[in-house]
Amino acid sequence: MTVIVPIHSPAVAPAPAPERVGVLLVNLGTPDSCDTKGVRIYLREFLSDPRVIENQGLFWKLALNGLILQTRPARKAKDYQKIWNHEKNESPLKTITRAQAHKLATSLSDRGHLVVDWAMRYGNPSMRSRIEAMVAKGCSRLLVVPLYPQYSAATSATVCDQAFRVLSELRAQPTMRVAPPYFRDSAYIDALANSIRSHLASLPFEPEIIVASFHGMPQAYIEKGDPYQAQCIATVDALRERMGLGDNKLLLTFQSRFGFDEWLQPYTDQTIQKLANDGVKRLAVVMPGFASDCLETLEEIAQENAETFLHNGGEHFSAVPCLNDSDGGIAVIRQLVLRELQGWL
């Protein structure tokens, strides 16, 4: 009797996709809509991050899910509505970050195996969705670029946390690098100086003083070792030197304080009000810590603080746009990316 034994061929793994290198630009985040519900969803994710609010104890959770998320979203929704890109139905931060990624990709188009994408740390498009998409496109190496010139645990570090969290759930992990802060890179300082000069040249007045306003943070975070304040100071020192301005002509301040703790000082709003009260009539504000214009620049500075200045005796106020997707801004990101991709291209 003849016995026929079927022979099973071993499973053949699919051929790997062509190897690519991914570059992921990451910005802070934005609500998906400018109504109360959309802002509440965004704020819950943002304020639940222990890198942002380090004390996530019971008292904070009760406060967050009680008073804060019941009252703050409606107020913030009104602020977002003032600056919302209604044509695209999205915040300016999303519009600009997308444009930055698109222009960066165009500037690197001669590197055929590069994939450039963008994500938000909070909100959409999420880092998880974009990292998974880049891996699916064959990216075996990934450069994550936090769009923060100055490092802070509340910004840059939480981007790293989330990137590693996503990688921890992947079987086939890409090799990953994270771009460092660029707070005193010559390309960044040059771009800031050129942007300020160009903007001031377009104004019908000459500012008596320029205020360099950075996002604030609790003083306690600095005392725990966060280098953010020192890097902000280094940026302004370099900018003063590049522009030939003394420390009485280019001031350093911190904005956007939240809660009752002491934050980095001097505070931007108080400084602007005092300048007006002291007789300063012409003022410009630049925000070097923001790679892209957003709620904090377009509404808080260009509207709220402008109103404060004008209502207290000031006569002329101008907010200098962030570098955004300008040629200078893209050149800064491009140089950073090419430097950090050395050995991979």
Curated annotation (Swiss-Prot):
Intracellular or extracellular location(s): Cytoplasm
Sites where the protein binds Fe cation: H215, E296
Superkingdom, taxonomy of origin: Bacteria
InterPro entries, per the entry: Ferrochelatase, Ferrochelatase_AS, Ferrochelatase_C, Ferrochelatase_N
Pathway this chain belongs to: Porphyrin-containing compound metabolism; protoheme biosynthesis; protoheme from protoporphyrin-IX: step 1/1
Record GO terms (molecular function): ferrochelatase activity; metal ion binding
Catalyzed reactions per annotation: heme b + 2 H(+) = protoporphyrin IX + Fe(2+)
Segments passing through the bilayer: none
UniProt-listed Enzyme Commission number(s): 4.98.1.1
One example of a Gene Ontology biological process annotation: heme biosynthetic process
Pfam families: Ferrochelatase
Main location: cytoplasm
Cellular component GO terms held in the UniProt record: cytoplasm
PROSITE patterns listed in its UniProt record: FERROCHELATASE (PS00534)
Function noted in UniProt: Catalyzes the ferrous insertion into protoporphyrin IX.
Protein name: Ferrochelatase
